[in-house]
Amino acid sequence: MIAIRQGRETGVDGIQALHEIGCTATLRQAQPLEDGRYDVVTVGTQRFRLAALDDSKAYLQGEVDLLTEETGDEAAAAQAARVVRDGFRAYLSALGERGVTQVSAPELPGDPVTLSYLVAASMIIDLGDRQALLAEPDALHRLTAERTLLSRELTMLRTLTATPAPDLRNSPYSSN
């Protein structure tokens, strides 16, 4: 899976319309809807860098280079994980106070790599922020970026009493 930079189609822009980093995905659930579409749940499994596109077939296909998963400096990553774990619990609590989520803070993983992906997947952030996290070279850099994002989001939740809004640009039009 790889995100399109803008809109729903790559159009004539090809590789320029796509983000450079994506991830392989495992299908967890596919539920048919009455209108013929499917509600699909996937889990990202391994990051990759898009190397080339092949548009000679009916569906656009890409050639990718799989990326290794690094922790970064072990001691610094462990410290960053402690800070992010606390910040993420505070974030979930603040969302709960605003009625956005009723999920209590789960038992968070101790492994910095796993924690970094759990936090990235769970935060209510826009595609640009989510893509930036995916593109970080290792868990330490991802956790450092998450610490900044958690601080920003907590400040907005506490100061502005604002709740994150979903990205409506890619949603079907509704007059409601």
Where are these regions (language model features)?
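N-terminal low-complexity, acidic/polar interaction/targeting segments
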Residues: 1-176
